[in-house]
Amino acid sequence: MKLSRRSFMKANAVAAAAAAAGLSVPGVARAVVGQQEAIKWDKAPCRFCGTGCGVLVGTQQGRVVACQGDPDAPVNRGLNCIKGYFLPKIMYGKDRLTQPMLRMKDGSYHKDGEFTPVSWEQAFDVMEEKFKTALKEKGPEAIGMFGSGQWTIWEGYAAAKLFKAGFRSNNIDPNARHCMASAVVGFMRTFGMDEPMGCYDDIEQADAFVLWGSNMAEMHPILWSRITNRRLSDPNVKVAVLSTFQHRSFELADNGIVFTPQSDLVILNYIANYIIQNNAVNQDFFTKHVNLRKGATDIGYGLRPTHPLEKAAKNPGSDASEPMSFDEYKAFVAEYTLDKTAEMTGVPKDQLEQLAQLYADPNKRVISYWTMGFNQHTRGVWANNLVYNLHLLTGKISQPGCGPFSLTGQPSACGTAREVGTFSHRLPADMVVTNEKHRDICEKHWQIPAGTIPAKVGLHAVAQDRALKDGKLNVYWVMCNNNMQAGPNINEDRMPGWRDPRNFIIVSDPYPTVSALSADLILPTAMWVEKEGAYGNAERRTQFWRQQIKAPGEAKSDLWQLVQFSRRFKTEEVWPEALLAQKPELRGKTLYDVLFATPAVSKFPLSELKEDQLNDESRELGFYLQKGLFEEYAWFGRGHGHDLAPFDDYHNARGLRWPVVEGKETQWRYSEGNDPYVKAGEGYKFYGKPDGKAVIFALPFEPAAESPDNEYDLWLSTGRVLEHWHTGSMTRRVPELHRAFPEAVVFIHPLDAKARDLRRGDKVKVSSRRGEVISIVETRGRNRPPQGLVYMPFFDAAQLVNNLTLDATDPLSKETDFKKCAVKLAKV
C-alpha cells in the first residue's frame, strides 16, 4: 500500500500515539472545547524530555484539567506526543505525597523505623542536626546532593549556591551526569564552550539526517515528526540510522545500520578516512578554523582504582592531548579501512560507503543527531569528538541545515544542569571550580569571602554512591530524580550505602519512588505548574512559566525547601574563622541572609507580580525570589557568549535561544552573520578557544569494559520506550500510559529465544555478575535486537534493570555506560 506524506504524518504523530493509550484524540478535543469557557489557559514547556515543546495548560478550580499543544510554540507548533497529551494526569496519582515522612521508632528517628508523617519543622530539625554533625565531625566533604536536569533554572542555581558557597562542598551533581556529561566534555574539548551551535530550524533545511545511537521516533517524537515531514517532502533527502538494534526510527531510514556494540568508534574513524581519501576535506575551512590533536589512549573505565581494568590502564582518566600534523592525522585514520571496518562492526560494506558519502558530498547539508547511544558509553566523550571531526573536516557546521547536534533527554539538562553549573566540577556559564579566576568571579559577584568555594572537584554521581558505601559521605540529599532505580549497579554500592546506619538520606519527590522508599526522610515536592519555573531545552531555548495552581497538602517546591533550609545555618557554623575575618559583617547572619536575601536577589518587589498571580515562595518571603535569582545568575553569561535576555522578556515569549544580544536570539553560533560574537570578515570563530579554532581529535577504537563470554553470553542494552519517561514515576501513574505498556519486557531475537527454549510471553531470569531480574520474553514488536543482544527498558520499578548494569563510566565525563554489559538468560 502506498502511504502518502499526509497519512504517514497523521498516523505517526497523532493517531498512533492516541491509539497506544486507548484514547481518541478527537474525543479529547471535544471534551476540551465543551469546557473551554470554564477553563483558564496559560503557557508552559512540557515536563518531559529535552525537546522543549510548548503546551497550553488548562486549570479549573485549582487543578490542571486539560492540556494541548501550543500552536504558537515554535518547537512543536501545536503538536504533542502521547506523554504530552496526558500531562495533567501526572499530577494526580493516588499515592501523591502531601506531607514529610520520617523513619521513626518509639517516637524518634530510627534508621530501621517505619515512615511516619511529621511536620516540616520536625523534618528540618532532623536534617539540621545531621548536617551540622557531619560538618563538625568530618567537614564539607561528608555531605552531598544529587540533583536534576528537571530542576527549574533557579532551583538548580539555588542548590549550587547553597552547597558550593554556603556549605563549601562541591559534592553536588545532577542526574544529567548519567545522560549528558559526555556531551558536555565533548563540546568543551572540541569547541571550548558547551551546547549545540545549531537549532531545530536546521531540520527543514537539511538534505540528510544521521542518527547515532538515537531512537528519535520514540524518545523525541515531535522532532521526529518534523524530520519525517522533511524526508517525505523531498525524495532527495536521506535518513541514516545507526544503532546496536533495530527500533522504530529504522522505519523511515534509507540506510538502517546495526553495528556491534562499541564499534561506532570504528565507523566514525572510517568516515573521516573516507573523506580524506576522496579529497572531500573543505580545505579553506579546515586551514582557517581547525587545529589537530592526538588524544591520550588506554584511559581506563572509571571503575574503582582496585579494579583489574583500572590497574591495567596505562593512562587512567587522562584528558591529555598533543598537537599533530594533518599528515599524521591522515595516517592515523588510514588504518580504518572499509574492509577492517566491515569486519569489526558487522556492517555490510555498501551501507558503510553510503553513510560516508553523505558526509563527503559537498552539496549535502548533513545533521548528525545523537543521544544516549553515544553519551552512555565508556568512550562517550571520544564518540562526541569523533562526530565533530566529520563536520569540521567538511565545514558542515554552524550553518542552516548542517551541523552536529547533541539531543537532551531531560527538560532542563541544558538550562539547569549545564548552564547553571550544578555538576561537581562546574560553576555558572561554563566556569569550573578548579580555576582560581572563575572562583574569584563567583565569590565577588556573590559577595562572599575569597576562598569560600573549594578548589577541589566534588564527587560525581557514581563516586557519590561509592563514598556512601565507604562511609565517607554521610548526609545525602536527593532532589527531583529517582536514582535508586535509574543509576547503575544498584546492589554493589548504592543500596548498601543508602541503608548504612552511618548515613542519612533525604529524598524530595512528589511520589513514593524506589528512591524515596529507600531513604530515611521523604520531603513532598511541588511539581511542574505548581510552582513558577524555567527550563532550557536542547536548542539553547530558555522558557518560563508561571505558577498556575497550588501544590496539594504540605508539598513544597524544591526552591522553597532549599531556601528555607538555609535559614538553619549561621555563617559561624559552616565557615572557618579565616573566611569570617575577611567579612566580619557576615558574622551572625544565616546562609539565607548571605545567599538568598541579599540586595541583589531581594531587590525585585512583590508589586512586579500581578495581584492574582500565584507565587508561593515569593509571597512568603516578601520579594520576587525567582526574578532575583535569575538576574543574579544571568549576569555571569552576559557579554561572554552565554547572554540570557532580561527576566520579563521570557514571560512574554515562547522561549529565546541564547546568546540573546540586543533583544535578538541566536539560531546558529560561531558563524558570521548569525552569531553576534563573530565579527564581519571572520567567517567562523569558535570563540570558546583562545585562538578561535575548533579541535579535531585523533582517537582510536577501544573495547567495552565488559563483553559477552561463555558464561554471560549476551549483550544487554537498556533504555526507554515511547509511553514512559525514565523510571516511570510519573507516566506509570497515568492509567492510559500504564495500560499501553504495563510492564517491562526483554526484547530478544527469536533465534536466541529458541536456542534457550524461550517463547514470547515466558518468564525469564536475566542475570549479570552483579544481580538478576525476572522479566518477560518479547520476540516481536518495536525493538528488534540482532542475535547476541537483548534490550530492556528501565521504567518498571518491579524490574530493577540496574541490578544488572555495570558502573563503568567514561573516564573523562564520569558518565555511566548503560548500553553495554554481559548477561545470561534462564527460563523461570
Curated annotation (Swiss-Prot):
Under Enzyme Commission nomenclature, its number is 1.9.6.1
Q: Which GO-annotated molecular functions does the record name? A: 4 iron, 4 sulfur cluster binding; electron transfer activity; iron ion binding; molybdenum ion binding; molybdopterin cofactor binding; nitrate reductase (cytochrome) activity
Q: Which PROSITE patterns match?
A: 4FE4S_MOW_BIS_MGD (PS51669), MOLYBDOPTERIN_PROK_1 (PS00551), TAT (PS51318)
- Report residues binding [4Fe-4S] cluster: C46, C49, C53, C81
Q: Which cofactor does it need?
A: [4Fe-4S] cluster; Mo-bis(molybdopterin guanine dinucleotide)
Localization, UniProt: Periplasm
Q: Which GO terms describe its biological process?
A: cellular respiration; Mo-molybdopterin cofactor biosynthetic process; nitrate assimilation
Cofactor binding, per record: Binds 1 [4Fe-4S] cluster.
| 4Fe-4S Mo/W bis-MGD-type domain: residues covered | 39-95
Q: So where does substrate get bound?
A: F794
* PTM comment: Predicted to be exported by the Tat system. The position of the signal peptide cleavage has not been experimentally proven.
Q: Which reaction equation describes what this protein catalyses?
A: 2 Fe(II)-[cytochrome] + nitrate + 2 H(+) = 2 Fe(III)-[cytochrome] + nitrite + H2O
- Superkingdom is Bacteria
Q: Which residues form a coiled coil?
A: none
- Positions of Mo-bis(molybdopterin guanine dinucleotide) binding: 83, 150, 175, 179, 212-219, 243-247, 262-264, 372, 376, 482, 508-509, 531, 558, 718-727, 802, 819
Q: What is the recorded function of this protein according to its Swiss-Prot or TrEMBL entry? A: Catalytic subunit of the periplasmic nitrate reductase complex NapAB. Receives electrons from NapB and catalyzes the reduction of nitrate to nitrite.
Q: Which PANTHER family match?
A: PERIPLASMIC NITRATE REDUCTASE, RESPIRATORY NITRATE REDUCTASE
Family per UniProt?
Belongs to the prokaryotic molybdopterin-containing oxidoreductase family. NasA/NapA/NarB subfamily.
Q: List the protein's name.
A: Periplasmic nitrate reductase
The organism's taxonomy opens as: Bacteria, Pseudomonadati, Pseudomonadota, Gammaproteobacteria, Enterobacterales
